[in-house]
Amino acid sequence: MHILDSLDAASLRSDVPEFRAGDNLKVHVNIIEGNRSRVQVFQGFVLGRQGDGVRETFTVRKVSFGVGVERTFPVHSPIIEKIEVVTRGDVRRAKLYYMRDLRGKAAKIKEKRDNAPTKK
C-alpha cells in the first residue's frame, strides 16, 4: 500500500487554493477541440467537496440564461488551469444541495466578512 500512497502524493497539485462550500469560484478549464486547445472559465458557487487525496472532487453550480448548470471537477485534475476564489460564502453546511430548489433572492449566499483589524 505504501507504493500507491507515494504515487498518489506525486499526483497531488500544490497550487489549489483553500475553498469550501458556498465560496464563489472561477475555474479555468482547458478545453480541447480537435487539434486546438483553449481555456474556458466556469464561474459559480461550490455546492460541496467530496473525497480525499487524488480522488477529491468539488461541484460548482451556476445559473446560465435561467437554467441551472452544475459541473463536477476533480481537484487535482490536469485539465484545470487554475482555480480563483472570487468571494467567500457565509454558510453553515458542508453540502448545499438545498440550493438547487431555491429561486431568485432566496438562492443568494451571504458574503463572509473578514474580521481583520482595520488600519488607522
Curated annotation (Swiss-Prot):
Gene3D superfamilies: 2.30.30.790
Disulfide bonds: none
Family statement drawn from the similarity comment of this UniProt entry: Belongs to the bacterial ribosomal protein bL19 family.
Keywords recorded for this protein, A-Z: Ribonucleoprotein, Ribosomal protein
Originating species: Renibacterium salmoninarum (strain ATCC 33209 / DSM 20767 / JCM 11484 / NBRC 15589 / NCIMB 2235)
Highest rank taxon of the organism: Bacteria
One GO term (biological process): translation
Lineage: Bacteria, Bacillati, Actinomycetota, Actinomycetes, Micrococcales
GO cellular component, one term: cytosolic large ribosomal subunit
Record GO terms (molecular function): structural constituent of ribosome
The protein, known as: Large ribosomal subunit protein bL19
InterPro entries named among the record's database cross-references: Ribosomal_bL19, Ribosomal_bL19_CS, Ribosomal_bL19_sf, Translation_prot_SH3-like_sf
Function: This protein is located at the 30S-50S ribosomal subunit interface and may play a role in the structure and function of the aminoacyl-tRNA binding site.
